[in-house]
Amino acid sequence: MIQTEQLSQDTILFHVRGPFHQNTAKELGLSVFRSYRLGFKAFLFNLSHVSLLDGEGARQLALIGQGLQDNGGTWKVIQPPSSVGNQLILRTSLQHFSQAMWN
């Protein structure tokens, strides 16, 4: 399940719950695309309630982020799932936020 929260005029937060697999990634990708078309430029992904992040889901999430970065957007995964292996993947490949966006 994916819920969105607008944090500012150009920043949106996606709350993802449940298992994160290829279908969830596709749903998230469509939501990100729609939000980008509406003018959002900064994207946060809260994965703290994800119960399972499989390899294909992680790959799809990285592709979503790469697409945002290639088109001038910024993104960050916050509170990754507790699995050590997945945390390492998320920390090394999914943390692409400009320094100006940090609090």
Where are these predicted regions, by residue range?
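STAS-like cytosolic regulatory interaction modules
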Residues: M1-N103
